[in-house]
Amino acid sequence: MEPFSAAQNKEDKDTSVEPPRRRCHRKNKGTNVEPPSSPYHPKVLARWDPANEKRPDIGEAPVFHPTSEEFEDTLAYIEKIRPLAESFGICRIVPPSNWSPPCRLKGDSIWKNKNFPTRVQFVDLLQNRGPVKKKTPKGRKRKRGKYSRTVAPKKRNGSVSKSVSTPKATEEENFGFESGPEFTLEKFEKYAQDFKDSYFERKDNVGDPSVEEIEGEYWRIIEKETNEVKVLYGTDLENPILGSGFSKGVKIPTRRNDMDKYISSGWNLNNLARLQGSLLSFEDCEISGVQVPWLYVGMCFSTFCWHVEDNHLYSLNYHHFGEPKVWYGVPGSHATGLEKAMRKHLPDLFDEQPDLLHELVTQFSPTILKNEGVPVYRAVQNAGEYVLTFPRAYHSGFNCGFNCAEAVNVAPVDWLAHGQNAVEIYSQETRKTSLSHDKILLGAAFEAVKSLSAHGEDNTKRFSWKRFCGKDGIITKAIEARLRMEEKRIEALGNGFSLVKMDKDFDSNCERECISCFSDLHLSATGCKNCSSLEEYGCTKHDICSCEGKDRFIFLRYTIDELSSLVRALEGESDDLKAWLSKVMEGCSETQKGESSGIIVKEKQVQEECFDLNGECNKSSEICEDASIMDLAAYHVEPINLGFLVVGKLWCNKHAIFPKGFKSRVKFYNVQDPMRISYYVSEIVDAGLLGPLFKVTLEESQDESFSYASPQKCWEMVLLRVKEEIMRRSNQKQDVHMLESIDGLKMFGFRSPFIVQATEALDPNHGQVEYWNHKNEKDSLEMKDCFMSNSSQSLSKARLFGVDLN
């Protein structure tokens, strides 16, 4: 990573890939067949006034140039630059020269044939406008059209229902965001260029305006009274409209091509939210605009107004193609300063609409902010570059011409404190949240418990989570802070409530929110036997009624004692760690459907071999996790049920104990369609005198089931079916060497360290003699090797937190 400096910023600015200045060839002038009354004919009433430009005199945001090696791990790089960049609110990241992902939007099928909606923006009214007589229901409207989680019903597979339509213009949207006409990208490019050519037309015809000249004119329009400046913006375009600019897809796994690095990279925004280490992986619902990227198609002066990300998340924006995008950022530490300054200078607008900043319809001068003591920094983003925004960092900006960008949110572990702060602010403002912070927090804690319990294998994953544990670990401190907060609130409610264990499915099918402040109720909820028949609940800060105490109750997912034990487990207390490992194993399917494994996806090479997964899923692929394919070397098993011990020769072998009723879940190639990845459920049932029967079932098609007396044979049968289907679909014989073998024990989960430890805990008396004899023999050999080599590292494999596990 090259350190940045003032000189670095200047050098970068001088050598940026800003589109070259060209002469304003008006060859298209007069060829536009659209009549002046057509919505596809830009109305240009104002003209460039360079003599009165208002370019703000502010500092530049830092620019980073990762090496190819640094660029390999997206979240690690963000963590690396955070101490240098967070105090600016935003930063620019210029990828290595070998990063040049093709943009799928440029194919004729999309560029010329797919329409997208636009929104009208009156740029001259984004700051200077009078109040509009309207009322907005307080706290009932989420920014950027992200629907309330109670309004958008979840499908059984966790995605947001497609029945919810794109928000339409209403009478409330009187400035900045009324609906505009639909365009193809090809037509919008011409519309945008016609507008820019007309607006900046010069008598001398010397060339296009520079970024600096456009910026000066933009702020003249914002700050000074001027003629109407009306532009269009294709903003917040959800995935089904145009899809992603990044390629994603699956292909026959035996083929390889040069696209793999772009499809599997964490810098592909389709993968970012689900990367190992991203806390958003613990939110099983696919939230559009948060985990699923949105596209933005801009033209000159089209604007994104001052805002912070939902739940104070990070955001990462990639500029696919076109003219530059100018950003402004305010560090999160000065967020309240920006809010105070805007309220001071725009009192009428805030009096009428206190939540004005949530609506993204108000721009505000960086010059005024600077004069009010609020630091503002600029970043000019060119095609092929990223802009990263930090938690609670207000940001805004505009486009210099026709371009296309894509953005998504991300939550590294350090976001936890910011997310909790956002929850408290949203509660005070009675504003709905996009995420269940408690669900994410518990998901991270459970992942940490599993990683702390692992030993001897999977070191990379274990160490990546272990560093967030311990007494001063980020996850430990976040759980402890949440525990103390909940403890005080329950005490404040008094003794008039009975404590009731929350059903594990309390919020599985619908999101529960406090009727008073809209806080998420995943961890706890207050209710009343008389009133809760209406499915109304409150948080531990609010009573929902004034009924008698005997009728009121508090649902607790975990008691205060259990949460205290979780804190101790994260600090490394072995007894608490074992207890929580058991809880995590039992409840894993409910709390960790958003598995934090890395996503590795494959690109199509020829059309007939692969589906395009950027648009809406068709029926056959709706159940699978589209655009993802596993790494054959790194199966990730999700335990569902641990089962119970049956002592007997057939219920173990020298490698594993086989609990009756054990059940797990893993992704593998679909036997019906190997170009898709689907979930399989592996389970162990009691076959009477025959002992355990191992069974593997395709989750989406229960008829596809494979049973045998060994886990190895079960999964070999699955593999054989996959290979047969691949051969059947191929016009010629395929090379299937990648699928020649499979490890049945690993696919069941019996090589996962935390599953091994949990099954061993079922047999404290070592009744499964064959398994324990082999384990003791193996451990003795390891200890002998350890003694001979004097290697403390090898010795540690037989111990966990100083406790002998033999």
Curated annotation (Swiss-Prot):
<feature type="binding site">
    <location>
        <position position="539"/>
    </location>
    <ligand>
        <name>Zn(2+) 1</name>
    </ligand>
</feature>
<dbReference type="InterPro" id="IPR004198">
    <property type="entry name" value="Znf_C5HC2"/>
</dbReference>
<feature type="binding site">
    <location>
        <position position="517"/>
    </location>
    <ligand>
        <name>Zn(2+) 1</name>
    </ligand>
</feature>
<keyword id="KW-0863">Zinc-finger</keyword>
<feature type="binding site">
    <location>
        <position position="514"/>
    </location>
    <ligand>
        <name>Zn(2+) 1</name>
    </ligand>
</feature>
<dbReference type="GO" id="GO:0009909">
    <property type="term" value="P:regulation of flower development"/>
</dbReference>
<keyword id="KW-0862">Zinc</keyword>
<dbReference type="InterPro" id="IPR003888">
    <property type="entry name" value="FYrich_N"/>
</dbReference>
<keyword id="KW-0156">Chromatin regulator</keyword>
<feature type="binding site">
    <location>
        <position position="542"/>
    </location>
    <ligand>
        <name>Zn(2+) 1</name>
    </ligand>
</feature>
<feature type="binding site">
    <location>
        <position position="395"/>
    </location>
    <ligand>
        <name>Fe cation</name>
    </ligand>
</feature>
<feature type="domain" description="FYR C-terminal">
    <location>
        <begin position="689"/>
        <end position="775"/>
    </location>
</feature>
<dbReference type="GO" id="GO:0005634">
    <property type="term" value="C:nucleus"/>
</dbReference>
<dbReference type="InterPro" id="IPR003347">
    <property type="entry name" value="JmjC_dom"/>
</dbReference>
<keyword id="KW-0223">Dioxygenase</keyword>
<dbReference type="Pfam" id="PF05965">
    <property type="entry name" value="FYRC"/>
</dbReference>
<feature type="compositionally biased region" description="Polar residues">
    <location>
        <begin position="158"/>
        <end position="168"/>
    </location>
</feature>
<feature type="zinc finger region" description="C5HC2">
    <location>
        <begin position="514"/>
        <end position="566"/>
    </location>
</feature>
<dbReference type="GO" id="GO:0006355">
    <property type="term" value="P:regulation of DNA-templated transcription"/>
</dbReference>
<dbReference type="InterPro" id="IPR003349">
    <property type="entry name" value="JmjN"/>
</dbReference>
<feature type="binding site">
    <location>
        <position position="545"/>
    </location>
    <ligand>
        <name>Zn(2+) 2</name>
    </ligand>
</feature>
<dbReference type="GO" id="GO:0034647">
    <property type="term" value="F:histone H3K4me/H3K4me2/H3K4me3 demethylase activity"/>
</dbReference>
<dbReference type="GO" id="GO:0045892">
    <property type="term" value="P:negative regulation of DNA-templated transcription"/>
</dbReference>
<feature type="binding site">
    <location>
        <position position="531"/>
    </location>
    <ligand>
        <name>Zn(2+) 2</name>
    </ligand>
</feature>
<keyword id="KW-0479">Metal-binding</keyword>
<feature type="short sequence motif" description="Nuclear localization signal">
    <location>
        <begin position="132"/>
        <end position="139"/>
    </location>
</feature>
<keyword id="KW-0408">Iron</keyword>
<dbReference type="Pfam" id="PF02373">
    <property type="entry name" value="JmjC"/>
</dbReference>
<dbReference type="GO" id="GO:0045814">
    <property type="term" value="P:negative regulation of gene expression, epigenetic"/>
</dbReference>
<feature type="domain" description="FYR N-terminal">
    <location>
        <begin position="629"/>
        <end position="687"/>
    </location>
</feature>
<dbReference type="Pfam" id="PF02375">
    <property type="entry name" value="JmjN"/>
</dbReference>
<dbReference type="InterPro" id="IPR003889">
    <property type="entry name" value="FYrich_C"/>
</dbReference>
<feature type="binding site">
    <location>
        <position position="547"/>
    </location>
    <ligand>
        <name>Zn(2+) 2</name>
    </ligand>
</feature>
<feature type="domain" description="JmjC">
    <location>
        <begin position="261"/>
        <end position="427"/>
    </location>
</feature>
<feature type="compositionally biased region" description="Basic residues">
    <location>
        <begin position="131"/>
        <end position="157"/>
    </location>
</feature>
<feature type="compositionally biased region" description="Basic and acidic residues">
    <location>
        <begin position="9"/>
        <end position="21"/>
    </location>
</feature>
<protein>
    <recommendedName>
        <fullName>Lysine-specific demethylase JMJ15</fullName>
        <ecNumber>1.14.11.-</ecNumber>
    </recommendedName>
</protein>
<feature type="binding site">
    <location>
        <position position="307"/>
    </location>
    <ligand>
        <name>Fe cation</name>
    </ligand>
</feature>
<dbReference type="GO" id="GO:0009793">
    <property type="term" value="P:embryo development ending in seed dormancy"/>
</dbReference>
<feature type="binding site">
    <location>
        <position position="309"/>
    </location>
    <ligand>
        <name>Fe cation</name>
    </ligand>
</feature>
<keyword id="KW-0804">Transcription</keyword>
<keyword id="KW-0539">Nucleus</keyword>
